[in-house]
Curated annotation (Swiss-Prot):
Apolipoprotein C-I is present in acidic (APOC1A) and basic (APOC1B) forms in P.paniscus, P.abelii and P.troglodytes and perhaps also in baboons and macaques. The two genes for ApoC-I arose through a duplication process that occurred after the divergence of New World monkeys from the human lineage. In human, the acidic form has become a pseudogene sometime between the divergence of bonobos and chimpanzees from the human lineage and the appearance of the Denisovans. Pseudogenization resulted when the codon for the penultimate amino acid in the signal sequence was changed to a stop codon. It is found in: Secreted. One of its GO terms (biological process) is very-low-density lipoprotein particle clearance. Its main location: secreted. Gene3D superfamilies: Apolipoprotein C-I. This is Apolipoprotein C-I, basic form. Pfam families: ApoC-I. The keyword Transport applies. It comes from Colobus guereza (Mantled guereza). One of its GO terms (molecular function) is phospholipase inhibitor activity.
Amino acid sequence: MRLFLSLPVLVVVLSMVLEGPAPAQGAPDVSSALDKLKEFGNTLEDKAREVINRIKQSEFPAKTRDWFSETFRKVKEKLKINS
């Protein structure tokens, strides 16, 4: 009786072992993950370039540069007068 039960169990176990590992059903493919990462990097690069161009074209850098130049000139004049 034991032999009759052991043989089918052994056949099922051997078939499972010889079948190999089951493919992961929910695991994403590595190449698709890399493609998504590349797309994200390109999007981020485009947005960063757009922001930098917007900053370059705005008046803020020019005003800041002028303010620093004017302040530096005033400090320089005060140091010349005191010296």
